[in-house]
Amino acid sequence: MTDFQFSKVEDAIEAIRQGKIILVTDDEDRENEGDFICAAEFATPENINFMATYGKGLICTPISTEIAKKLNFHPMVAVNQDNHETAFTVSVDHIDTGTGISAFERSITAMKIVDDNAKATDFRRPGHMFPLIAKEGGVLVRNGHTEATVDLARLAGLKHAGLCCEIMADDGTMMTMPDLQKFAVEHNMPFITIQQLQEYRRKHDSLVKQISVVKMPTKYGEFMAHSFVEVISGKEHVALVKGDLTDGEQVLARIHSECLTGDAFGSQRCDCGQQFAAAMTQIEQEGRGVILYLRQEGRGIGLINKLRAYELQDKGMDTVEANVALGFKEDEREYYIGAQMFQQLGVKSIRLLTNNPAKIEGLKEQGLNIVAREPIIVEPNKNDIDYLKVKQIKMGHMFNF
């Protein structure tokens, strides 16, 4: 269906809140499947029968870690060999059920799982409902239907559990696009992607918190160092702030990705150390600005992998080819954490110090107002000139040489 448009995440959340079933699909390079999803609090016989009739797949009950611990739901196997490490627990039936398989009895089991008074001894093992334990951090950690189900229930203000069921076509194969789209239209059912849900959470969830603020005298001048910690990963970042940000408008700013080799060792394989020095100098001269120092070593692949990439470059690859050879994208960085740090600092609009167009787009996608790009001007050397040319040619970096 060429004219099909996915639903808004807000509409999907509202449908979940109202007890309706929605359709969610994952990435093409993952399972590439659509699942029915609803909240466990609305695991009615009607909803379960609909999933069994039209979905035909296994009806599961994604739950949070807290619920799994409370009810003593243990992993189904000691060593998980599932292709996507889906966290099945031992299957269960509620003790008030008979065989446990009918839509009515599966409804009882699912709803009792989210009963505030439920306890481990209320369930027989094995059974006909299949709890799945969602990863802490949800779809931002694992892009699966398990995590999408629990995230959607949480965002709807409901208990952190739900139902999901894969959708098969009439011939027994898994239903894919455009048949999933056609089904959603025919049944007036909200249809979203896990990628949409990830993007929604990056914009709306509070994913970083400020820990401390201290004076930081540097060789460039005196700054205030604001420390931040990511809520999900525990990764630590720093914002170096100069001057008064009260109005938050047109702040001279830079997002600088950590580069131990360039920033601390003075490596000439890259221009990172020079860019950091240039940005600090410009902000000091302006008397007002922010540098976010993010823990994104090696364009997000980490220090050891960056050094492995250097090893491949010494054998003839360029910086992009080396990253790809190691199984990474040319640039693994995300900018939603940086955008949230700017927001917590009261920054409303920025003049961004960067030569990287992807950084501009990444911040704009998070709703940050970039009123101007300020180039970072550094002189190439004999050791990094080829690296800089590759970034210019293959990654679109805006250099003037």
UniProtKB/Swiss-Prot annotation:
One of its GO terms (biological process) is riboflavin biosynthetic process. GTP binds at residues 254-258, 275, 297-299, 319, 354, 359. It holds the Pfam family DHBP_synthase. D-ribulose 5-phosphate binds at residues 30-31, 35, 142-146, 166. Binds 2 divalent metal cations per subunit. Magnesium or manganese. Binds 1 zinc ion per subunit. Its EC number is 4.1.99.12, 3.5.4.25. Residues 1-203 are annotated as: DHBP synthase. The record marks 128, 166 as: Essential for DHBP synthase activity. Keywords: GTP-binding, Hydrolase, Lyase, Magnesium, Manganese, Metal-binding, Multifunctional enzyme, Nucleotide-binding, Riboflavin biosynthesis, Zinc. It catalyses: D-ribulose 5-phosphate = (2S)-2-hydroxy-3-oxobutyl phosphate + formate + H(+); GTP + 4 H2O = 2,5-diamino-6-hydroxy-4-(5-phosphoribosylamino)-pyrimidine + formate + 2 phosphate + 3 H(+). Mg(2+) 1 binds at residue 31. Catalyzes the conversion of D-ribulose 5-phosphate to formate and 3,4-dihydroxy-2-butanone 4-phosphate. NCBIfam families: PRK00393.1, PRK09311.1, ribA, ribB. HAMAP family: RibA, RibB, RibBA. In the N-terminal section; belongs to the DHBP synthase family. This is Riboflavin biosynthesis protein RibBA. It comes from Actinobacillus pleuropneumoniae serotype 5b (strain L20). The gene is ribBA.
